[in-house]
Amino acid sequence: MIEKCEVTGVFGSGKYPLSAQYYALIEIGGAYAHKFIPFIEFLGVPCLILTDLDSVADRISKSGKVVKKSVVVSQGETTSNETIKWWIRRNKGLPENDTSKIDLTVITSMPPDDKTRGKCHIEFQTAENGLCGHSLEEAVRNVSRKHYDLGDSTSEEDLEFKGKSKTDFALDLICECADYCVPAYIKSGLTWLNNQRVLE
């Protein structure tokens, strides 16, 4: 996606484009990424966190208990993503052990400036084409509708990722899908990372 952003001019010009700089990609689930932020802050290196919105809502289970169920973003009440919850609590000055519910609209309306803390920046899915996916796969499908044979009247349910594993989906993008589009939240995050210009 970095190369696709560079080729299409998303980053503008610079002496050291992102693809010419050293960077490491580390895959950590949204439940644990925030645990590494103090270490990143200690190192003082730029860190981009691309994570899933993971919208959920309270539902009654078969046993009669209230449980959090994964739902489309328009029906979401909050997120199950611990890193996003940690980030919001930090921005609001709340203790890490705070368990109050964070409304999904607070998350989806987070101002750009609130997505950066020191050398760390967080991005997650945003609305595009009138819809918002709650995962990378749904976001890519949303902005690459032609490739996935999805029309203009696509619903959030149509974007739902089914079938292949997340790894297979990503490898298909790299190896088989030259015409996919990069979701706005990824462009935004990679632009932030590119603008850190560590070498200049």
Task: For the regions a language model picked out, list residue spans one by one.
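Acidic, divalent-metal-binding catalytic cores of TOPRIM
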Residues: M1-E200
